[in-house]
């Protein structure tokens, strides 16, 4: 593996997760446990990529509070170079999720107004321009405003660097709608793919055509424990994740898949191999209590990769 320069722009905040201990009872008090850590789609991916051996810089707005200090400490622990712009009079964004006993999401609340201040003007600052110019990969999540995502695509157009996106949620993925053609890859789940295209796929094999018609040249659509599909301009493939006997928490699994996929892409691996690496990274995260698994490493990824079947190439 060659160590690459990576810039990540997007969410770096506090994740709060409550896990219900028994069968979920809507509209009632449910016994459970509470857990808090640094998170965010971009930040989870940044930490994974750093643990896989790359030089990663994280750019994100932050409040001048203890939550911001928690995020900074998490960046340092993972080896991420922290490049925040801090608003001393604001609070750091947060994401609060309630999970069922099996780890699946019941409902979540995102308190993330601060990200609206990540304006296109921030991309014009000299330090940011130099950081982007020096990067082999630029990864952005949809916590950024739509106009900032569009400006980022325009700023990286005509270069050799890879530009990728993380959908974050069905409500936020539509922020990419004006700049899909400028992305090399977008990582999303099926609900996010539906929100982006306004269409329903009868089978996973239909997503590449639907997303290409929407203007996207490459991407990955995950479907929980069912087959995931990846595509680029010319090819597509389908892979079924291995069955997992125990599920710790689904939080961060999609971000991990993006990390594993992109790390393989930077190594020159083909589409099918990238999807296998992405699934392996997601498996590592699904077995971890953390949104960015501390066990993420090239060695552990290679070990889990042996459990992932070869993808089926689609015509």
What do these predicted ranges mean?
Residues 61, 87, 97-137, 142:
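Conserved phosphate-binding/catalytic loop of the ribokinase/pfkB sugar-kinase fold
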